[in-house]
Regions:
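Active-site metal-binding loops of divalent metal-dependent hydrolases
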Residues: 6, 30, 70-73, 93-97, ...
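Core dinuclear metal-dependent hydrolase active-site scaffold
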Residues: 52-111
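Cap/insert and terminal regions of metallo-dependent hydrolase folds
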Residues: 100-175
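Short amphipathic alpha-helical segments
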Residues: 14-16, 37-40, 103-104, 125-127
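Active-site metal-binding motif and surrounding structural segment of the metallo-beta-lactamase
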Residues: 1-28
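Active-site neighborhood of divalent metal-dependent phosphoester bond hydrolases
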Residues: 31-51
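Short, surface-exposed connector motifs at secondary-structure boundaries
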Residues: 18-22, 85-87, 158-164
Length: 175
């Protein structure tokens, strides 16, 4: 299991998977601290956790895996770049904007999993309180459909084969 950040919707089961099922949980030291502080963690991580350093590749059998920083309002948020047999997968969810570092990892991808969280009009007109709308639209919130589309339109590479959009809001999107 590779953890991107310490928000409840991403970590609820990692304690059980790691400690009870003996599945290694890979994360940064700071994300691990955030996980163990979280109210939603009934099973804290201890023996199953494996630490990653951002932008330092690790090998897991034939997989070369590298984490990298992405802007979001959790603790020490990361995306992942995974390479096997010359094919590169970049995974970025829960990010408020695409930084130069994130763009670099996207440019390496043959297969890209990228957030397109919300439609701006649906979010603005929807039932969320204003503070939550502002959080979502912030530079450490989430990517809008249009921001994701604009980035992709300007940055498609010849070697990019597939794109999957992820973290689509059920309340503020119409995929």
């Amino acid at each position: 299991v590779f953890v991107t950040h310490d928000h409840a919707d991403h970590i609820k089961a990692v304690g059980h998977l790691g400690e009870k099922m003996n599945i290694p949980v890979y994360t940064t030291a700071r994300i691990h601290e955030g996980i163990n502080r979280s109210y939603c963690m009934t099973e804290k991580l201890s023996t199953s956790v494996r630490y990653l350093e951002k932008q330092v590749p690790m090998m897991l059998e034939d997989f070369r895996i590298e984490s990298f920083e992405v802007p979001h309002d959790g603790t020490d948020n990361v995306g992942y770049c995974i390479e096997i047999d010359g094919k590169v997968f970049s995974f970025l969810t829960d990010l408020g904007e695409i930084t130069p570092t994130a763009a670099d990892y996207i440019s390496k991808a043959n297969y890209l999993i990228l957030e397109a969280n919300y439609d701006e009009e649906m979010l603005k007109m929807g039932p969320y309180p204003q503070y939550l709308k502002e959080r979502i639209m912030s530079r450490t919130g989430h990517m809008s459909n249009s921001a994701t589309a604009e980035f992709l339109a300007e940055n498609i590479t010849e070697h990019l084969r597939y794109i999957w959009l992820c973290h689509l809001s059920k309340d503020n999107n119409h995929p």
